[in-house]
């Protein structure tokens, strides 16, 4: 093979790694999605090794730019584990490479794996055998299988001659994304640098809170559910350095309970009940919840010590809070200049999926914002957000972020400098500094529960808002989700960001007919990305109506698709 600069050695290295971790003969097929590869931790060895190979080849393809591998299964039970590849921009693996990752993970034997790698390297013009440098940063969460699987990933990386594996330690998933992005931009990229940037930018935002907004309604006590995972541990490490907040961590990962078991953002958002680890002393206080690898964030308040129900603030309402804050700063800056032009013209994009609660979308539209919809999945939301000067997206589950384009940040820095020399301390100067600090605080690579939580706290203090003020932005419409088992989920074809059905013929008309029977009715169906079911989502003005609408539409799906 001409594409192998050190043919025999490279072949031998790949064959040896594949032989060490053969897939079980009856193993399930892997499919690389938003979550990467996931399964029971004990069965993940082969997929993790092969993901290491993919990451090393991706780095080689990109001229040696750092690529990341994180060992985590996020909000899944502790017995599970997984592997995700972080692309050089700090985002998710390029979708163009997902079929190759699938093919490699499912290669039945070492020879098949070798041939897949050789063909792909030839197609992508990747010179193997050490002529291209490659570097892969690796991290893991706190799962018991994590240490072993990280070692397996290192062996996969090392199977590509010339690739260097760097163990960054036990980290949150967003920390590794941040590190990869920062390293490739030539910025400081250690964990210490991450913490310094987050803490300093949060402190800056607190210093810019207007004196008249420093109201008594803001209690600085914040109770955080760490899901018994890495996010709780990291918060415990730095909470003493975070000014302006009295942080108490429950489910910190120091042995109080089991990872993600009856706690964490996924549990809180779906079950809408008090997580384990909270008691009567927490009633009425502002609470935040991370998921297992700290890339999701939701807030809640315990209503009563005699009731497990909570007041939930999900990703939709976090998005709404951030939108109000950012737009207010832009409005302050854009006091018209002498020519009637905007001082800082800004393309501000708000991105949601069909699963966003209709009340949140109505709220955003009613304050004059255009909402753009994408298909379900962070990779679609993130890609759309990148098109704007400021692009913000959140899923209801609490995963999301605010993206600032490099060009916009550069403009903002110049404007801040100009204000500093001509109008230091003016409202415009302070608003520009707030936006700059926000761009430093919120993770520019991926959703990050820790930095997102600090931005929430800074905005609440800026606005002088209590938790109740935040809750009162709007009232969520009741919703219901159902799954319908079908013979072939792919016989459903959707359009308009999965909000309408174009195949099979006639189904959308039936859905529209059902929706018309309910006040504030909304319903859509879409094929599941992971199992042979069709997912039904319905909203209406009451829980009973939402239930009825979902069931009626599910019956139509079942009748037509069997």
UniProtKB/Swiss-Prot annotation:
Q: Which domain of life is it from?
A: Eukaryota
Recite the UniProt keywords alphabetically: Isomerase, Magnesium, Metal-binding, Phosphoprotein
Q: Which Pfam families match?
A: AMG1_II (PF21405), AMG1_III (PF21404), PGM_PMM_I (PF02878), PGM_PMM_IV (PF00408)
Binding residues for substrate, per the UniProt record?
395-397, 526-530, 535
Please name the catalytic residues of this protein: 74
Enzyme Commission identifier(s): 5.4.2.3
Associated pathway: Nucleotide-sugar biosynthesis; UDP-N-acetyl-alpha-D-glucosamine biosynthesis; N-acetyl-alpha-D-glucosamine 1-phosphate from alpha-D-glucosamine 6-phosphate (route I): step 2/2
Q: What are the GO BP annotations of this UniProt entry?
A: carbohydrate metabolic process; UDP-N-acetylglucosamine biosynthetic process
Needed cofactors, names only, are:
Mg(2+)
Positions that bind Mg(2+)? 74, 291, 293, 295
Phosphoprotein listed as a keyword: yes
What is the documented function of this protein?
Interconverts GlcNAc-6-P and GlcNAc-1-P.
* Similarity annotation: Belongs to the phosphohexose mutase family.
Question: Can you name this protein?
Answer: Phosphoacetylglucosamine mutase
Taxonomic lineage from the root: Eukaryota, Viridiplantae, Streptophyta, Embryophyta, Tracheophyta
């Amino acid at each position: 093979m001409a594409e192998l600069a050190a043919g025999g050695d490279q072949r031998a290295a790949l064959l040896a790694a594949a032989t060490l971790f053969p897939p079980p003969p009856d193993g399930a097929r892997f499919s690389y999605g938003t979550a990467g590869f996931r399964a029971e931790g004990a069965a993940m060895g082969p997929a993790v090794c092969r993901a290491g190979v993919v990451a090393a080849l991706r780095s080689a393809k990109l001229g040696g730019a750092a690529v990341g591998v994180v060992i985590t299964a996020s909000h899944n039970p502790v017995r599970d584990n997984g592997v995700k590849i972080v692309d050089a921009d700090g985002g998710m693996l390029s979708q163009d490479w997902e079929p190759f990752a699938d093919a490699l993970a499912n290669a039945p034997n070492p020879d098949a794996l070798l041939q897949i790698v050789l063909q792909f390297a030839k197609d992508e013009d990747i010179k193997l055998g050490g002529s291209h440098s490659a570097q892969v940063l690796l991290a893991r969460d706190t799962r018991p299988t994590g240490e072993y699987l990280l070692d397996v990933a290192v062996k996969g990386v090392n199977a590509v001659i010339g690739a260097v594996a760097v163990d960054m330690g036990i980290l949150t998933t967003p920390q590794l994304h941040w590190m990869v992005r920062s390293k490739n931009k030539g910025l400081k990229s250690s964990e210490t640098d991450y913490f310094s940037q987050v803490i300093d930018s949060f402190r800056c935002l607190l210093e810019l809170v207007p004196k008249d907004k420093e109201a008594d309604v803001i209690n600085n006590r914040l109770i955080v559910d760490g899901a018994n995972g890495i996010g709780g541990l990291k918060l415990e490490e730095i909470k003493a350095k975070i000014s302006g907040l009295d942080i108490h961590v429950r489910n910190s990962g120091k042995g109080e309970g089991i990872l993600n078991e009856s706690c964490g953002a996924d549990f809180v958002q779906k079950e809408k009940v008090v997580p384990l680890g909270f008691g009567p002393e927490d009633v009425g206080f502002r609470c935040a919840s991370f998921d297992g690898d700290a890339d999701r964030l939701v807030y809640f308040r315990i209503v009563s010590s005699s009731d497990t129900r909570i007041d939930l603030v999900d990703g939709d309402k976090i998005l709404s809070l951030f939108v109000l804050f950012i737009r207010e700063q832009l409005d302050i800056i854009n006091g018209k200049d002498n020519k009637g032009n905007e001082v800082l013209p800004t393309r501000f994009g708000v991105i949601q999926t069909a699963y966003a609660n209709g009340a949140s979308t109505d709220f955003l539209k009613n304050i004059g914002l255009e909402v753009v919809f994408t298909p379900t999945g962070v990779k679609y939301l993130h890609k759309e957000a990148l098109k704007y000067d400021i692009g913000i997206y959140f899923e209801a589950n609490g995963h999301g972020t605010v993206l600032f384009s490099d060009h916009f940040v550069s403009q903002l820095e110049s404007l801040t400098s100009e204000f500093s020399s001509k109008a230091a301390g003016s409202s415009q100067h302070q608003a520009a500094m707030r936006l700059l600090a926000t761009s430093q605080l919120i993770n520019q690579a991926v959703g990050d529960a820790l930095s997102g939580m600090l931005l929430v706290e800074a905005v609440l203090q800026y606005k002088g808002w209590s938790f109740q003020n935040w809750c009162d932005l709007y009232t969520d419409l009741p919703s219901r989700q159902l799954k319908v088992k079908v013979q072939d989920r792919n016989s459903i074809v959707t359009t308009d960001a999965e909000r309408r059905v174009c195949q099979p013929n006639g189904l959308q008309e039936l859905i529209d007919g059902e929706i018309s029977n309910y006040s504030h009715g909304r319903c859509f169906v879409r094929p599941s990305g992971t199992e042979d079911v069709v997912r039904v989502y319905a909203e209406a003005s009451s829980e009973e109506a939402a239930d009825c609408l979902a069931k009626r539409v599910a019956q139509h799906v079942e009748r037509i698709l069997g």
